[in-house]
Amino acid sequence: MFEQVPVPTPFQVGRVNAYLADRTLVDPGPDSDEAWAHLQDELADRDLAPDDIEQLLITHPHPDHFGLANRFADRGATVVAHPDAAQIMADFPGHLEAEQTYFRDFFERCGMAPSTADAVTELPEAFVHYAPSVTTDGKVRAGDSVMVDGHELLVDDLVGHAAGEILFAFDGATGREAIVGDNVLAEISPNPFLQPPHEPGADRPHVLPAYNDSLAALRDDDYDRFHPGHRGHVEDPPGRIDDILDEHTERTERVADFLDEPRTPVEVMDELFGDLPVTEQFPGMSEAVGHLDVLEAADRVSVREENDRILYERDE
């Protein structure tokens, strides 16, 4: 039903997969002249122009996935996304600024030097150029559906890679299939990125425990094929999910072994990954804090704050 259309990005992950069916486009890619020109060529090869696209479906609000939505919206396309994604995409610079403020303080409390915390949280400012704000016309969540080329696509919520993640499920050539964004990838393990609190003063989401639960539920839905946001199709979704969960369990146990005395999240990150460059420290902290959250949820560690430092220690 959907045709995969790889779109170039300026990011380390490489090309992002857009998906095209009739006049509907899923995840058009980042807002760059290179991506726009490439996508126009791909559409022209199918006797289409940007003005012909009537509907954009967005799996999650990361710049490499939704950035070009604004150009299509300006040409009359409707934009469909989860309400949480819609809120982020409506003011991406403002969302990023709030994230920077939260994580600058949080990373210092995790044991990061103030100068490093500044550098880590300032890096995403470069993303703003590729993600102009866009208004969402249709807001959907689990249980809703959208029509594409005469077919009903069911929406389900996902957790773990970004706020406001959703999948679009449909009956395809191999059976039950779904476009899943970056929640499950064929060749690389998705990053369980840290997320700020949903509102000021609230607790931050514990992303990795929720991601593990979401993956287990998705595995039990018994899909036959996933269409991911990067690289090739996932031909054995339950098996791939099991592999990801096994990787998570192995890393969680590595973290547990390291907590025989009080450790900060930064010390855990250093133990896991060594001397990471600044560009890799946000995903590194996401991994370290995520596995500490898993251990905390299982009552295997105690957590306390001393002298403005968060410390974890194994209870076993």
Model-predicted regions and their roles:
Residues 31-32, 150-240:
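Metallo-beta-lactamase
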